[in-house]
UniProtKB/Swiss-Prot annotation:
InterPro entries linked to this entry: LpxK, P-loop_NTPase
GO biological process, one term: lipid A biosynthetic process
SUPFAM superfamilies: P-loop containing nucleoside triphosphate hydrolases
Biological role: Transfers the gamma-phosphate of ATP to the 4'-position of a tetraacyldisaccharide 1-phosphate intermediate (termed DS-1-P) to form tetraacyldisaccharide 1,4'-bis-phosphate (lipid IVA).
EC class (word): transferase
Name of the encoding gene: lpxK
The protein's name in its UniProt record: Tetraacyldisaccharide 4'-kinase
Metabolic or biological pathway: Glycolipid biosynthesis; lipid IV(A) biosynthesis; lipid IV(A) from (3R)-3-hydroxytetradecanoyl-[acyl-carrier-protein] and UDP-N-acetyl-alpha-D-glucosamine: step 6/6
Similarity comment: Belongs to the LpxK family.
A Pfam family matched in the record: LpxK
Assigned GO CC terms: plasma membrane
EC number: 2.7.1.130
Binding residues for ATP: N62, V63, G64, G65, T66, G67, K68, T69
Length: 335
């Protein structure tokens, strides 16, 4: 039921159907509500928390994943190489926990969300999740006073937290879908919102003027049940694999595998899907290949021939220089 509805929604948002016209009046109402809410924050009718350290928001204006996680990993690498010690906060989408607490590499994805667990495993940084990002940020800085910067994974629309930089990630293949706001389309805010942000990063596809291109580079496969074991991707060229993806745009993953020469039988799932062993009845003893985000949720019941494909982001060095220069100016103001 959930998967069917999710796929139906995507067809409406990224296609051209009559449902868009029916839902459009609700989108106009949604626009009025979000415009009034943002105005209230600008007029300081609603309070925003100003932290003692710089805050970088990495978000999007679309519903669903656009590639924020690999970007955050890249951003952490750039910052660490230049002397910064960031902490990360997240809403923890897909997790059941209602409390604010720290995520560790052994945290359960079903409790804290799949992306936070993956980020901790890949970066080793302190990361706190919570329904209120302001509270998560406070807890993080209290427990890790050595952190001198906060990265908010998502949270572009969370105006209760003041920010020093906003970076938006866009799916370069699907862009804005039909261009409509929720519920007629996939947009949380109108595309004009991009005029106010500091940088726009396109995950694949040619970037628009002034934007930055992010390319996702596949690495050696790792075994889901024993990530220390590796296998070169070229060992599977020409072989049939069951490809599993519960991400914002599963077709991107499937297409990437096909371009690499694999014979792909695709199994798309909704973003943040909570996998069970029953989801893999199709697999039998065949090879299963999934994303790293999916793998963190399948370790408990993974079979011997299940593998995941880590990816790393490559982005124009000019963006890193822009971010670092902005942070330098911010720190000079504090002195």
């Amino acid at each position: 039921m959930g998967q069917s509805f999710s796929r139906w929604l995507e067809r409406q948002w990224y296609g051209h159907t009559g449902w868009q016209l029916i839902l459009r009046p609700f989108s106009w109402l949604f626009y009025i509500l979000i415009a009034l809410r943002r105005l209230a924050y600008r007029l300081r009718l609603f309070k925003s928390l100003k932290l003692s350290v710089p805050v970088i928001i990495v978000g999007n204006i679309n519903v669903g994943g656009t590639g924020k996680t690999p970007f955050v990993i890249w951003l952490v690498q750039q910052l660490r190489q230049n002397g910064w010690y960031p902490g990360i906060i997240s809403r923890g989408y897909g997790g059941k926990s209602i409390h604010t607490h720290q995520v560790t590499k052994d945290s359960l994805p079903q409790e804290v969300g799949d992306e936070p667990v993956l980020l901790v495993q890949r970066t080793g940084l302190p990361l706190y999740v919570g329904r209120k990002r302001t509270r998560a940020a406070r807890h993080l800085l209290r427990d890790y006073p050595e952190c001198n910067l906060i990265i908010s994974d998502d949270g572009l629309q969370h105006y209760a937290l003041e920010r020093d930089m906003e970076i938006v990630i866009i799916d370069g293949e699907r862009i804005f879908g039909n261009g409509q706001l929720l519920p007629a389309g996939p947009l949380r805010e109108p595309s004009s919102r991009l005029e106010d942000v500091d940088a726009v990063v396109f995950n694949g596809g040619p970037p628009a003027a002034g934007g930055y291109l992010m390319q996702l580079i596949p690495e050696d496969l790792r075994k889901v049940s024993a990530p220390q074991e590796r296998m070169a991707l070229n060992e599977l060229i020409g072989q049939h694999v069951h490809a599993v993806a519960g991400i914002g745009n599963p077709q991107r993953f499937f297409g990437q595998l096909e371009q690499l020469g694999l014979v792909v039988e695709a199994h798309p799932f909704p973003d943040h899907h909570a996998y069970t062993e029953d989801d893999f009845e199709f697999a039998k003893d065949d090879i299963v290949l999934m994303t790293e985000k999916d793998a963190v949720k399948c370790i408990a019941f993974a079979r011997e021939n299940w593998w995941f494909m880590p990816i790393s982001a490559e982005i124009d060095r000019a963006l890193a220089e822009k971010i670092l220069a902005r942070l330098t100016r911010l720190m000079e103001k504090e002195i």
